[in-house]
């Protein structure tokens, strides 16, 4: 996130903002603040609860400033009241502004977000086609952006041997690097669960027992499944 933030009332957010598919539950994010967001938790990315500073950071910041007190006794006396003063300050802000959110300086417009989603979707579908060409089974592309903050799409597919996983991964890496200039992070050698992370698209390649055991489709059950344009996908072998 960019370091500079600006406060704005949630009700004054851009009208007509791109709305993602509604979900019944979201994976919670851990925040460092002693205060929690208000009851409405459906603030779309990149908006998050504004109270991100921990009390420890507030105390450290204030104690390092010489504008407030001079000398050890004055500083100690000041710090003893910081906790109470900080809580009162936050209470006053909530009473005055209600639901407050922050925007980073690099927030994209709704149109730009839609364009990025479309580009990522095209990339994901092309990678899924690679898996299909190498005879992977039960290929699914899930739009997980509303559920996680670190990627837009999952590709989940079943392979039936480690050499097949290696072949799928190699062809995906080649396509991504040559056509899109992207290099994957993640597993280099094929595993029973092999992960390739291209940033906006994350691929999960499973052997059948691990696909059944981890059942990512159920774990991310609120994600929208993308209809793939190619047909005749291989089915998992018994």
From Swiss-Prot:
It is found in: Plastid, Chloroplast. InterPro entries: Iojap/RsfS/C7orf30 (IPR004394), NT_sf (IPR043519). It holds the Pfam family RsfS. Keywords: Chloroplast, Plastid, Transit peptide. It comes from the Eukaryota. Interacts with chloroplast ribosomal protein uL14c (rpl14). PANTHER family: IOJAP SUPERFAMILY ORTHOLOG, PROTEIN IOJAP, CHLOROPLASTIC. Belongs to the Iojap/RsfS family. This is Protein Iojap, chloroplastic. The gene is IJ.
């Amino acid at each position: 996130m960019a370091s500079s933030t600006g406060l704005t009332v949630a009700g004054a957010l851009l009208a007509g903002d791109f709305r993602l598919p509604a979900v019944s539950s979201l994976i919670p994010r851990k925040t460092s603040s002693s205060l929690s967001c208000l009851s409405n938790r459906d603030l779309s990315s990149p908006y998050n609860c504004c109270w991100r500073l921990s009390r420890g950071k507030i105390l450290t910041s204030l104690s390092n400033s010489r504008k407030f007190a001079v000398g050890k006794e004055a500083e100690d006396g000041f710090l003893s009241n910081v906790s109470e003063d900080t809580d009162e300050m936050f209470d006053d802000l909530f009473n005055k502004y209600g639901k407050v959110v922050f925007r980073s300086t690099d927030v994209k417009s709704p149109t730009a977000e839609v364009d990025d989603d479309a580009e990522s979707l095209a990339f994901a579908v092309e990678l899924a086609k690679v898996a299909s060409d190498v005879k992977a089974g039960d290929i699914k592309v899930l739009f997980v952006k509303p559920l996680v903050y670190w990627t837009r799409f999952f590709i989940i597919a079943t392979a039936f041997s480690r050499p097949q996983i290696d072949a799928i991964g190699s062809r995906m890496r080649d396509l991504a690097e040559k056509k899109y200039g992207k290099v994957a992070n993640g597993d280099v050698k094929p595993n029973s669960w092999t992960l390739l992370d291209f940033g906006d698209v994350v691929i999960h390649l499973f052997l059948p027992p691990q696909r059944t055991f981890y059942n990512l489709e159920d774990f991310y059950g609120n994600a929208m499944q993308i209809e793939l344009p190619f047909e005749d996908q291989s089915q998992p072998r018994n």
